[in-house]
Regions:
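Catalytic loop of short-chain dehydrogenase/reductase
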Residues: 1-26, 36-39, 45, 49-51
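C-terminal helical subdomain
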Residues: 33, 55-127
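Flexible loop/turn segments at secondary-structure boundaries
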Residues: 40-41, 97
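Residue-level detector of anion-binding/catalytic polar loops
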Residues: 30
Length: 127
């Protein structure tokens, strides 16, 4: 789907979130990596419109950019946020847990089957 540079960037973000969570936990700061599904950005929608047969159905499953904000808002309000810190989360799955919907009222489907499982890191800390 994407090239190695894209994948390396995503993997680096996941590891950075994990490592930052260790450093910031004593200060009460939570850090997570959030995996979004296909985003219905203006650019993405133009691509879909230019080749509707090629991308049939994909727009129906795309998440709005506002959906990301709604999930982040729910996370910020979660009194148990620190228990999620240092982990990778799929936005659609968090949304289902929090009862968050997209701007059109839909509950986006988790892209886990397409993207694979989220990254997990060990608890070892070297000081």
């Amino acid at each position: 789907m994407h090239g190695p540079a894209y994948g390396a960037g995503k993997a680096g973000t996941d590891k950075l979130a994990h490592d930052m969570a260790v450093d910031f936990r004593p200060h009460g700061v939570a850090v997570i990596s959030l995996w979004m599904g296909l985003l219905a950005t203006e650019r993405t929608l133009r691509v879909f419109a230019a080749e509707p047969d090629k991308y049939a159905g994909m727009a129906d499953n795309a998440e709005s950019p506002e959906f990301s904000g709604r999930v982040i808002d729910a996370l910020a309000r979660d009194p148990q946020l620190m228990s999620r810190s240092g982990q990778v989360w799929i936005a659609a799955e968090l949304a289902a847990q929090y009862g968050v919907t997209d701007i059109d009222g839909r509950q986006p489907v988790s892209p886990r089957a397409f993207f694979g499982d989220t990254t997990c890191f060990g608890d070892a800390v070297v000081e």
